[in-house]
């Protein structure tokens, strides 16, 4: 079963260039291991939240378009991975090994299989 791992981070947290490099190296190693296992089926890093545009329309009303991400949290979605795991426990285990989980939040969500992909 496929799971989306939504990686959330505080984009305003100050980190050194050395720490940024350490994190990038850790993510690359994690992704290489997942590819070798045949479990990484997709994913991308996202541009900063300030580049987001939010589109909302409730109950068929007027469309509201706003610059920026949906508010309410200091952590923003920084990227996502799509992994193929045997079950939720396996996906949670994978999420705990993502370096971003050590300094942010990883939301694990099953992918709805529609047959369209």
Protein language model features and the residues they cover:
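Conserved, structured core segments of small domains
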Residues: 1-117
